[in-house]
Every structure is written in C-alpha cells, then in structure tokens.
C-alpha cells in the first residue's frame, strides 16, 4: 500500500504512526517541550529524550517497542542554528520528529527493513533518489560492516550508494558515559538528476541537493566511565528520528521546508501583514517572512506550556526568539503589533493535533502581544542609540562596537545582544561579542549552565538487582506492614562543607548508630515523587529500631527507607515491621488533596492558563506554583479560598481508579505537563470538576481537609506565581497567630475595636510628615555646610570647588556630612550637577550608620560618553558593596565605611578609564 502524493503533513504523521503500530509498537504521545526531570537540557530536542531513562536502565516501560511524533526545539547548546533559520531551506527552531524505538527488542535488521519499507513502499519514494551512510570505523570504534551488509541485502545497493562516513557523522553518544553506537542515515536528493558525486556538498539555498531525512541509531555499546573501554550492551536498542518537515518537503514536491503545508501558511500570513509579496527566494524580505513563521510557531508552543518571556533560562530563550521575530517584522515595515496574529494562525493550523494550543489560545495571544508592545519601545530606543554610535564610529574609523556599549544596551535597555549583532552587521560593523558576554555575565544577567543530573549510585543498582520485581507499595490501603529486608545500604559522609558527599555500599548487617537505606520487598512507606515528600516512621524487628527520616525512589522499581539504626542490629533476610508516622501521613494527605482543589479554584478564578508548574506537599507545607503573569489581588485570593472551602464543606468522597491513559483523558482527567505518566495511570476524582492524575496519598473525603487558608502569594520566576497554604490544625494555628499579632498591634497603636486601620493610618501619615521635615532640615544643613565634612559654611556654591575637567567633562567628587540619607544625597548631587552645567558628572558619598552610601549624577550630554550605572560598580566594590542605575543616575551602598574616601576619589580615575575605552 502506498499513499497518494502530494500528501498532507497530517496524513504523513498518521501514516508513520499507523505503520509502526501495525508492527507492534506502542504509540506514545509527544512529551512536553520542557524536559521532565532532566536538567541537562533546555528543551526536548529529539524523540529519544523522553525514553532516555529507559535506554540507561533507570526506568522500565510495559512495552519494548515504541513510536512517536515528538515536538522539538533546537535553539541552544550544540544544536543551535538560530542564525540559519529563514536563511536556508532546512533550518527551524521548532520541528516535529517522527521516531521508532526498540528497548532491547529488535535491532539493525528490522530497523533497516522497517525504514526502507516505509519510505519506498508506503511513502513511494524512488530508491534512485536515496543513498545511505554507515560508520566507517575510526576513533577506536569498529566499522559497522553489519549494517552495510543488511543495507545491501534490503536495498540491492552497491558500495557506491552505501557511503562510509566518520565519527562526527555516523557515531552517536548520549554523553561522556552511557549507551552509544554507530548510526545510519538515509539521504534524499532534491533536484532533477540525483548525483552521488555531489553528496558531500551542502544543499543550495533553494534546498536542491542531498539532505538527510532519517537517522537510525544502533545503541550497541556502553561506556561506563569517560574515555573508558566500550562494552557491548546485553540488549542492544534502536533510536531513530525523521523530521516531519523534511519528509513533507519530499512528498509534497517542494525543496524548502517553508513551502510545506506545515509552514507555508504562516509565511503567507507574515507576507499578508507586511503588505509585501513572498517570492520564496533569498531576498531579505523573504528571509524575514520565514523567520517570523518559524519563531511564531516556537513562541506559541512554549507559551502553551507555561513558558513566559523573561530574563532567565528558558524564558530568556523565548524572549530572544520573539524579539528576533518582531525585529524582522520591523524590517518588513510592519509598524504595529503583529506577532500575536501569526501565533494565532499557528493555533488555527495545529490546534487539532496539539490541543494545548487551542486550550491556551487567549494566553498565547495576550503574551505575544504584550511582549511586542514592550519590545517596540525598546527597539526604537536601541536603534536610536546604535545609529548615533555608528555615526561616531564612522567619524573615528572604528569597525567594532565596543563590548561595554553592546552590554549596556542589554543590561540597561533589555536590547538582545544577538540583535545588536544583526543590526551592526547590516551597517557593516562588528561587535565585541565575547567581551559583551563577559560583562553581562559579571552583571548577573547571563543564564548559567544547567547542571546535569547525578548518575545512579552503583550501590542502588546492586540493590535493585537483588529484587526479583519492583518494590510493591501497600500504603494506599495500609500504614503498617511486615516484609523481608532484601538489601541494606550503609551511608557514610566523606568530606566537609561543599565537598561533602554520600558514599554508599551494600552491607549484610547494620549496627546501632549506622546511617542506612533499607530495601524491602513491599512497603507502606510512600517514596517521594510527584511533589509529595517521602514518608517518615519506624522499621522494627527483634529489639532493633530504625528511625526512618525519609523515603526515596533513586531508581525505577527501587524504594529506600533512609534513616539511622537507634537500637539493636538489622540483617539482610530478616523480617521487619514497617510503620508510617500516622500524624505526618494524615497531614500530608490533607495538604495533597487540597492542592488539587486549589488547582481547580485557580483556573476558575484566574482562567485556564493558571496551570500547575510545580508543587511540594508534606505534613507542614503546601506549596503550589502556577502560571500567571501578575500578583493576585486580595479579592482573588479570598475567592480562591472560598471556592476551596466550599468544596471541603461538601465532604465529597475522594475516589481513585487505575485506568489506561487514553481513557483517563477521555473522562476529563487533568494531566500536568511536567509530570511523567505511564500507559496506565491513577485517576483521582474529588468532584465532577476536580479530576486529575496523581500517584500520591490523599484524604478519604474532602471534609478531612478541615480548613484551607492561603498564607502567602508571590512570584518565584518569570510568569510563575507561588501560593503557600495551610490545612486542618495548621490552618487553625495560622489563624490564631494572625489574631495574636492583631492584638499586639492594637495594644501598640492604642486602638479599640475596629479602629486599628485608622490608627495605623494616622501614625504612618505623621511619620511621613516628620520625614519631610527631617529631609528639609538636612537639605538646609547640607547646602550651608560647604565642603568640609563637619560643616563650616560656604553653601552649595563652595562645594563646586575642586571640580576637574576630564576630557571635556566637569567631574566633582565630594563627601558630605555623615548621616545624610540616600534621598538627600541624591537630591544634592542633582543640584550640584545642574550648577556645574552641561557635560558634568557628580559623585557624593556619606556614612550612614555602619553603611557607606554613594550617589552619581550625570548630565544628559555626559551620558553620550559615560554611564552612571557603569561608573558606580567598581567604586561600590571599594566599600565592599554593589550598585547600579540608569545612564544618568546611579546609587550604591557598602559595608566598608573606612574606604569611603578612597571610593569617592576613585570617580576621577573611573571617568578617565571610561573615556579612554
């Protein structure tokens, strides 16, 4: 059977998945773009990412064959082709990867046969337009002659169509350690006459030439340590990936991914908004339209997952992509916010396949429009500054924009460094990118590297190997139970402070005083997962007692009870009694159930965009993070509390069911993007409106929660808010604490009944009036004090004595009477700057208690050559502090008052240095 061409991308995707489903593969939904429990990645960039733990043995699935269509983003790390997006026919930041996977089931022969059958029989691609590549055997790895032989048998190709390439092209590794193996790529020729002699050439801008469409990775080795020997895997695995956009270009008869039905509609939307035609060539306008199409797609998908454009980590990557698209719209002459319209076109075209787009339609539109409105003013300001700087550089003959200038555009105005590069290049200037990045990093603005996850401890692997099956959890029904010790892991702390680390080793016996991790066959203890903390309690047997302080799951199927042997001794094979701390478990159950009702209430009050981004529930804590781009009002908090407590008062029964994932979704269960789910899930039903997937322990009925009270609300990250709340007796204790605090406030304010707020208002108003009077007195004293530290007359004019001319700028640095508050310091510096006139810079300093305070003021004309925020940073370090501010005004503070005079005098040196650079 073959499909008719040109085929829609939806049909190609569906055909791929159906092909592998018919061959025994489990069809697995796309994982979220934000990696689940994998801090080594910024975004999911391949289909295998969600199976990484399966390949490494950390996780087990109920299937050995899988296939998926995975949404991917490649925009950071080694897969960063941002500058090529829109320029070439192949590069995008967002794409879909079709893949089939084998976890120790079939290997090379079946993988190659599947790929060839699908491409040539089902998709009906002519073999004459295909070549394959295999690994040639370099770098200490053997050549993949096995794959070559299979390809010859399956395709009938000679060696001229089975090309041998090296380590960089045809050998895949997960990292310095872990599974690895050769890979085999299938390439397609876009153009009239396939020419194998041109294979090594890059495809042309229009897409003609050879291009990879499918990669088959044969994981057959494992490296246990960096630079160590390769060891054959006992169960070799398969990981393949084929870009849907590339496949669509082949089967829709076009040479550019941007002319496929996945992207052409978005390109046309950009053309429509610009009022210019799209010709599909390499002209600047065509490139800009393609950039907008790709970047709008990336933005829509990330926002749908709760990523908001901000300054840190993933949020900054999103902001960078959005602002790059906006910049290209500006270049096309679009003079109004437009990106949200292209993003909504993404929703319209892809919302059926990816319902999260449709569900977050309003959020996507609002966030993209808000970001564009903000950035348009930044763009206008940044362009003006750059144009002025370019004029100066042309006059002086400079060709490279200094690092400080590029960094200042980012730190002061939020103008992206890569955008500065693009605009500079358009005007034939270079940018000192390395220097600018160093300055930005020093200012704390750069996103630091993401630390990789720790490897599984060998002792845990050994402990897991002793189990015939995964540890059975009995805690849904029981809080106590008996079991047999299968393994004891002794834990010792080696090193101190930051160098301290846990060293684990399996032992047969543990005596009193030993720190241990106990493994049994079945346990009522809940191991930490899904935001719920691990249970605490006791393990006892024959005079032995272990206080369990935590329960963890370091490896799939393995549960360890962490604690200390307080009495007696325990041995492997011994029967023990396990008892969960009832009070702690009950409080945790109340808090956990409350988080689910809270999630529902947040969506009800704030909108469907208020999605869970994280949670932490234990006996004393209920912490819930959710997507929302502003603080909650007092009225919203009250409404959320009311909704939760109204549900609690119904005392509705909490029920759980084990269902297939598809059935749970059909019945309306809410799944959380950050959570991992298997094929069978535990569905929690509290009310018809509150139905979610959860593996934790819960109250039997909502009435068990008792009372729900929000204790705080605030921001924790870009576009993410956090609620802390209490339930049951903890909520009652919180309410009593608030009552006691109010009683103390009434006593201090001498208030009666309900007039506390009025009394406090009068006290605050009186304090402000006194502050104004004090500030006025300080101003008069300062203006009459003259240049001496203790006063002495002369007034403000006398303080101008000693101003120096440095490079045409009048520079004045003074210490004023100690005790001068920062506001008065700033006001006086402003007056002195105005007295000095045009092209002036003033720094004043004073000791206020045990702190040194500094203020810098620059005239407008002086900011063309100097920046107050940059001048004050090295000066602040002299007094052991830090500071910053605008180009014309900056303040700083420090703790080393003894160095205040030296810091003030340093202004002259810093001005000279800045002007020289």
Curated annotation (Swiss-Prot):
GO CC terms for this protein?
Answer: cytosol
| Cellular localisation | Cytoplasm
Q: Which UniProt keywords apply?
A: Aminoacyl-tRNA synthetase, ATP-binding, Cytoplasm, Ligase, Metal-binding, Nucleotide-binding, Protein biosynthesis, RNA-binding, tRNA-binding, Zinc
Catalytic function, reaction form: tRNA(Ala) + L-alanine + ATP = L-alanyl-tRNA(Ala) + AMP + diphosphate
Biological process terms from the Gene Ontology for this record are: alanyl-tRNA aminoacylation; negative regulation of DNA-templated transcription
Q: What is stated about domains?
A: Consists of three domains; the N-terminal catalytic domain, the editing domain and the C-terminal C-Ala domain. The editing domain removes incorrectly charged amino acids, while the C-Ala domain, along with tRNA(Ala), serves as a bridge to cooperatively bring together the editing and aminoacylation centers thus stimulating deacylation of misacylated tRNAs.
Stated role: Catalyzes the attachment of alanine to tRNA(Ala) in a two-step reaction: alanine is first activated by ATP to form Ala-AMP and then transferred to the acceptor end of tRNA(Ala). Also edits incorrectly charged Ser-tRNA(Ala) and Gly-tRNA(Ala) via its editing domain.
HAMAP family attached to this UniProt entry? Ala_tRNA_synth_B
Q: What is this protein called?
A: Alanine--tRNA ligase
């Amino acid at each position: 059977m073959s499909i008719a061409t040109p085929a829609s991308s939806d049909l190609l995707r569906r055909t791929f998945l159906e092909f592998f489903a018919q061959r025994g593969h489990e069809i697995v939904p796309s994982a979220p773009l934000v990696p689940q429990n994998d801090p080594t990645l910024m975004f999911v960039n391949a289909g295998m990412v969600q199976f990484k733990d399966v390949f490494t043995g950390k996780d087990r699935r109920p299937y050995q064959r899988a296939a998926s269509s995975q949404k991917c983003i490649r925009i950071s790390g080694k897969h960063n082709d941002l500058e090529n997006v829109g320029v070439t026919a192949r590069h995008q930041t967002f794409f879909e990867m079709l893949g089939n996977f084998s976890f120790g089931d079939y290997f090379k022969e079946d993988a190659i046969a599947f790929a060839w059958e699908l491409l040539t029989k089902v998709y009906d691609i002519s073999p004459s337009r295909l070549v394959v590549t295999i690994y040639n055997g370099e770098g200490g790895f053997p050549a993949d002659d096995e794959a070559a032989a299979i390809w010859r048998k399956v395709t009938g190709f000679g060696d001229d169509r089975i090309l041998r390439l090296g380590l960089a092209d045809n050998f895949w590794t997960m990292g310095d350690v872990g599974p690895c193996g050769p890979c085999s790529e299938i390439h397609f020729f876009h153009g009239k006459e396939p020419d194998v002699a041109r294979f090594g050439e890059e495809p042309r801008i229009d897409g003609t030439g050879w291009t990879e469409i499918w990669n088959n990775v044969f994981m057959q080795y494992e490296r246990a340590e960096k630079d160590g020997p390769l060891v054959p895997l006992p169960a070799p695995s398969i990981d393949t990936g084929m870009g849907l956009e590339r496949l669509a270009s082949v089967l829709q008869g076009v040479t550019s991914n941007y002319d496929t039905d996945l992207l052409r509609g978005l390109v046309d939307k950009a053309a429509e908004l610009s009022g210019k035609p799209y010709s599909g060539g390499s002209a600047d306008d065509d490139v800009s339209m393609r950039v907008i199409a790709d970047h709008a797609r990336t933005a829509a998908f990330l926002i749908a997952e709760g990523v908001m454009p901000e300054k840190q980590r993933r949020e900054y990557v999103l902001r960078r992509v959005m602002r790059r698209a906006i910049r290209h719209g500006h270049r096309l002459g679009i003079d109004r916010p437009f990106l949200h319209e292209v993003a909504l076109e993404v929703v319209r075209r892809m919302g059926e396949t990816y319902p999260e787009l449709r569900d977050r339609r309003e959020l996507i539109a609002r966030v993209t429009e808000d970001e564009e409105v903000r950035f348009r003013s930044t763009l206008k300001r940044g362009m003006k500054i750059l144009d002025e700087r370019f004029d100066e550089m042309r006059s002086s003959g400079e060709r490279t924009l200094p690092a400080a200038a590029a960094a200042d555009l980012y730190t002061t105005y939020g103008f992206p460094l890569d955008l500065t590069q693009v605009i500079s290049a358009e005007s034939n200037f270079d940018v000192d990118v390395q220097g600018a990045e160093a300055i930005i990093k020093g200012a704390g603005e750069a996103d630091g590297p993401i630390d990789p996850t720790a490897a599984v401890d060998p002792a845990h692997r050994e402990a897991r190997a002793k189990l015939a099956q995964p540890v059975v959890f009995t805690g849904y029904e029981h809080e106590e139970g008996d079991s047999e010790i299968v393994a004891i892991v002794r834990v010792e702390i080696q090193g101190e402070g930051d160098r301290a680390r846990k060293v684990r080793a399996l032992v047969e016996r543990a005596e009193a005083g030993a720190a241990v991790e106990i493994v049994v066959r079945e346990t009522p203890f809940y191991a930490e997962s899904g935001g719920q903390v691990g249970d605490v309690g006791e393990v006892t047997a024959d005079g032995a007692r272990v206080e369990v302080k935590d329960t963890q799951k370091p490896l799939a199927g393995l549960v360890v009870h962490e604690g200390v042997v307080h009495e007696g001794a325990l041995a492997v094979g011994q029967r023990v009694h396990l008892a969960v701390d009832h009070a702690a478990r009950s409080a945790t159950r109340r808090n956990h159930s409350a988080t689910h009702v809270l999630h529902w209430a947040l969506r009800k009050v704030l909108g469907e965009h208020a999605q869970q981004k994280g949670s932490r529930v234990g006996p004393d804590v209920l912490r819930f993070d959710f997507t929302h781009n502003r603080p909650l009002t007092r009225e919203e908090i009250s409404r959320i509390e009311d909704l939760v407590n109204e549900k609690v008062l119904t005392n509705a029964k909490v029920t759980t069911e084990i269902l297939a994932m598809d059935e749970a979704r059909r019945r309306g269960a809410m799944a959380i993007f950050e959570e991992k789910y298997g094929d069978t899930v535990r569905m929690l039903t509290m009310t018809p409106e509150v139905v979610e997937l959860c593996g934790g322990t819960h109250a039997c009925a909502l009435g068990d929660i008792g009372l729900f009270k929000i204790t705080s609300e605030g921001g924790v990250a870009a576009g993410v808010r956090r609620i802390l709340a209490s339930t049951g007796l903890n909520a009652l204790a919180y309410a009593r604490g608030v009552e006691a605090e109010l009683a103390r406030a009434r006593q201090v304010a001498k208030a009666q009944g309900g007039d506390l707020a009025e009394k406090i208002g009068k006290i605050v108003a009186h304090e402000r009036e006194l502050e104004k009077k004090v500030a006025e007195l300080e101003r008069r004293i300062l203006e009459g004090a003259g240049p001496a530290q203790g006063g002495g007359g002369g007034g403000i004019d006398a303080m101008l004595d000693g101003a120096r001319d440095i490079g045409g700028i009048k520079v004045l640095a003074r210490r004023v009477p100690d005790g001068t508050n920062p506001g008065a310091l700033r006001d006086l510096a402003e007056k002195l700057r105005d007295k000095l006139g045009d092209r002036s810079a003033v720094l004043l300093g004073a000791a206020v208690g045990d702190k040194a305070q500094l203020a810098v003021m620059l005239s407008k004309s002086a900011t063309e050559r100097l920046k107050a925020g940059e001048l004050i940073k090295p000066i602040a370090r002299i007094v052991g502090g830090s500071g910053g501010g605008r180009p014309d005004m900056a303040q700083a503070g420090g703790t080393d008052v003894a160095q205040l005079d030296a810091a003030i005098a340093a202004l002259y040196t810093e001005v000279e240095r800045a002007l020289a650079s």
